[in-house]
């Protein structure tokens, strides 16, 4: 059945199904769908979906986040707009604010995911896990090609595609170096008809 703790608000368009429990002081909705979900105290789930997963206390989900089965999201976490999490564990204090996919991953405490981060978990034959240590900083538009481990306190430069493990406290840069071709545009200008 469904259980809702004292002081929690269910806003319009919210649907709770299966064995779903909502802690005390939560705000769920508007337009949220939770099925077999366990939500901790003082957590907000705004216009998002949570399936067969657990969310800790004082965590903010959404808007427009999709928490797929098998996920455990800790406390004091931000899962923002257009973030999808599948079969992953996210430790306390981590921020995944927008436009990110975290699948088949184990994420440490106090990590920061830049916009457009993707854990690339499937090679057409098998799904692999990504492990991210505590206090890691992942720059925008990063691809993490699993299986891969990101060490504690490491940084990943924006635009990187990571294929090898990153040691703790290291900076990983995995992108092509920019080249500027002087006067290229002038030489290749489209002639008006």
Question: What are these regions, as identified by a protein language model?
Answer:
Residues 181-193:
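Short, charged, intrinsically disordered terminal tails
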Residues 2-173, 178-179:
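Structural signal for interior beta-strand "rungs" in well-ordered beta-sheet cores
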